[in-house]
Regions:
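N-terminal glycine-rich FAD/FM-binding segment characteristic of electron-transfer flavoproteins
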Residues: 1-208
Length: 208
């Protein structure tokens, strides 16, 4: 199993944790030239890196990142490499003939998809629980060779990477302030009068 994200040098710590959990090889696709990339430029870069180390039978991607939540990287890698893709996988079984049967979530329903390898599968968190790191893995993770891939290592069009290759750019991020709800305070001492006021207020907002 090979683990390989795109990210800053600080991602090395996560990769070494992956070794402790059983990963065989770790790669880090990192370069200042990749900075500011949107999903299109990122997937192009990762697809080029995958092609460099050799096409695997199966590529797993998380369904989405926790920052932009686009869920586009996996499908775009598949499109760039020209291989099959299934998104939102919640269960996977392997066929003897070298294919996959994938259960994917589609809103409130589920679909069962059969596909041939090589393929990209983007997975939901509930697909599997990560294994615990072994003592041997923890002790040996610092000795694992980390392979660094930079822009100079790839056969790519530099106009398609980083911020230059990104047709979409984030100009501003601002919090969404939810509308304030109007509060109702009933100060009448008579219980029946208080109930009448409450009922009338609920009718005005179509609750009853």
């Amino acid at each position: 199993m090979t683990v390989f994200p795109g990210g800053p040098p600080q991602a090395e710590a996560v990769l070494r944790d992956a070794v402790a959990m059983g990963a065989d090889d770790i790669y880090l696709v990192t370069d200042r030239a990749f900075g500011g990339a949107d999903t299109l430029a990122t997937s192009y870069t990762l697809a080029a890196a995958i092609s460099k180390i050799g096409m695997p039978d199966l590529i797993f991607c998380g369904i989405e990142s926790i920052d932009s939540n686009t869920a586009q990287i996996g499908p775009e890698i598949a499109a760039t490499l020209g291989i099959a893709d299934v998104s939102g996988a919640s269960f996977i079984s392997f066929e003897k003939e070298g294919g996959l049967i994938v259960t994917r979530q589609n809103g409130s329903s589920a679909e069962v998809v059969e596909l041939k390898l090589p393929a990209v599968v983007t997975v939901l968190p509930e697909l599997n629980k990560p294994r615990y790191s072994s003592i041997k893995g923890i002790l040996g993770k610092g000795d694992a060779e980390l392979h660094i891939i930079t822009a100079a290592d790839l056969d790519i069009d530099t106009a398609r990477i980083g911020i230059k290759g990104s047709p979409t750019q984030v100009k501003r991020v601002r919090p969404v302030v939810p509308p304030q709800k109007e509060n109702l305070r009933i100060e009448e001492k008579d219980p029946q009068e208080s109930v009448d006021i409450l009922i009338e207020a609920l009718r005005k907002i179509s609750v009853i």
